[in-house]
């Protein structure tokens, strides 16, 4: 009798387990997509892809690269596209990025949209001009205390067909990087010692993608050049250092870097209006690209000025290049302002924050600042201060162009 009860108990337990397994398998079949699905793009292109991933990564795996400054984190909203059919309901992580009208039109963040079934989507046509390269580090020196000038050499015969002010995406592999291994030139090591920057370690377990504005202009062929600032944790915080910038600061000549692009929206308007460029920090990159393009490639006769803010002379770079441009082009002037000049600078030039310097030394006496076009890229506080100052002067928002990536 006891043996029968044991056998019955084992049988019932086995039946329950098998029943639960069956339920899980049925649920998995309904909730987790498998097999292949078809993605129709712009009614002209078709991809057959495995189901189960996110739309952004699925497209990238098939050489259709949407911009994603945050690397698919759902924060930058650069990877937006229109899902005509097959994307399911918009997720809460997407809602804040779209108006109600856009939501009704099918706008989605591709990094948040699951690929579960056949889909129809629309993307900008220029996406099909985006390419992927494996580039080689040509040089990576400091140009300021916390800014590197990274120059990447493209494969032989390759070029990036970009417009001044454009950007590309860099791919950073999983890594462990120790700041003590960074190659920092002697003239910049003082602040690294002062803030004990050498103690940081960057540990990254998955591939990271970030967007960076290019510092070169279209006629500087065969290379892509960037000004990249190290993203160190705020003092007293337990936050990790920047994943991509830590990896970039450790790059040496000969290292390989995967690049996607080009992308961009921060382009110069094709008008005859006066151009005023305002920059700070690593926001130098798109400023250089634009100004060199206007004066060297386009031979523009538009009135152009550049206002750049740095803490001290050690933090200012490309100064000789701008001096030469100014000497060669009577329609161009540039102005460097230092917010904290050091005794060794022997500085007799402009001082203060760049938005105040620009206002006091130029715009307050300008006959029509509202007729100018303003192009800016710098730290967030600088951008906000400049935008407020320009708005107070009556400049329309359409004439204030901002690059959020470079600073």
From Swiss-Prot:
Domain of life, source organism: Bacteria
UniProt-listed InterPro entries: 2Fe-2S_ferredoxin-like_sf, 2Fe-2S_ferredoxin-type, Beta-grasp_dom_sf, Cbr1-like_FAD-bd_dom, FAD-bd_FR_type, FNR_nucleotide-bd, NqrF, OxRdtase_FAD/NAD-bd
Pfam families: FAD_binding_6, Fer2, NAD_binding_1
Record-listed [2Fe-2S] cluster binding positions: 70, 76, 79, 111
Membrane-spanning segments: 6-26
FAD-binding FR-type domain sequence ranges: 130-269
Co-factor note (free text): Binds 1 [2Fe-2S] cluster.
EC number: 7.2.1.1
Gene3D superfamilies assigned to the protein according to its UniProt record, in alphabetical order: 3.10.20.30, Nucleotide-binding domain of ferredoxin-NADP reductase (FNR) module, Translation factors
Domain 2Fe-2S ferredoxin-type, first and last residues per copy: 35-127
Reaction(s) catalysed (UniProt annotation): a ubiquinone + n Na(+)(in) + NADH + H(+) = a ubiquinol + n Na(+)(out) + NAD(+)
Gene Ontology terms describing biological process: sodium ion transport
Coiled coil: none
Family: Belongs to the NqrF family.
Complexes and interactors: Composed of six subunits; NqrA, NqrB, NqrC, NqrD, NqrE and NqrF.
The protein, known as: Na(+)-translocating NADH-quinone reductase subunit F
Native source organism of the sequence: Pseudomonas paraeruginosa (strain DSM 24068 / PA7) (Pseudomonas aeruginosa (strain PA7))
């Amino acid at each position: 009798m006891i043996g029968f009860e044991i056998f019955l108990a084992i049988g019932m337990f086995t039946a329950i387990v098998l029943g639960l397994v069956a339920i899980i398998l049925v649920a998995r079949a309904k909730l987790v997509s498998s097999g292949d699905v078809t993605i129709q793009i712009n009614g002209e292109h078709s991809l057959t892809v495995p189901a189960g991933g996110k739309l952004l990564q699925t497209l990238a795996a098939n050489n259709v690269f949407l911009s994603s400054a945050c690397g698919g984190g759902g924060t930058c909203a650069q990877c937006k596209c229109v899902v005509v059919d097959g994307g399911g309901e918009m997720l809460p992580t997407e809602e804040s990025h779209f108006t109600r009208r856009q939501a009704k039109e099918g706008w989605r963040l591709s990094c948040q949209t699951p690929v579960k079934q056949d889909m129809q989507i629309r993307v900008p046509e220029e996406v099909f001009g985006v390419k992927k390269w494996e580039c080689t580090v040509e040089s990576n020196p400091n140009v300021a205390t916390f800014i590197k000038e990274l120059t990447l050499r493209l494969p032989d015969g390759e070029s990036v067909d970009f417009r001044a002010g454009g950007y590309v995406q860099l791919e950073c592999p999983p890594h462990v990087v120790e700041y003590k291994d960074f190659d920092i030139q002697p003239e910049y090591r003082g602040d690294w010692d002062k803030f004990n920057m050498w103690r940081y370690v960057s540990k990254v377990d998955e591939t990271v993608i970030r967007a960076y504005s290019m510092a070169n202009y279209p006629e500087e062929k065969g290379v892509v050049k960037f000004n990249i600032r190290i993203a160190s944790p705020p003092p007293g915080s337990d936050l990790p250092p920047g994943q991509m910038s830590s990896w970039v600061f450790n790059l040496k000549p000969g290292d390989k870097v995967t690049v996607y692009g080009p992308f961009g929206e921060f382009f110069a308007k094709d008008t005859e209006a006066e151009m005023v460029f305002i920059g700070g920090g690593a926001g130098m990159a798109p400023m250089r690209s634009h100004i060199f393009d206007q004066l060297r490639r386009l031979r523009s006769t538009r009135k152009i000025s550049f206002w750049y803010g740095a803490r001290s002379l050690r933090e200012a770079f490309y100064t000789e290049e701008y001096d030469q441009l100014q000497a060669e082009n009577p329609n161009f002037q540039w102005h460097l302002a230092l917010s904290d000049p050091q005794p060794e600078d022997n500085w007799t030039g402009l001082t203060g924050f760049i938005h105040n310097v620009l206002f006091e030394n130029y715009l307050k006496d300008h006959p029509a600042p509202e007729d100018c076009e303003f192009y800016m890229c710098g730290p967030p506080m600088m951008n906000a201060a400049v935008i407020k100052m320009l708005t107070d002067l009556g400049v329309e928002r359409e004439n204030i162009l901002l690059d959020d990536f470079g600073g």
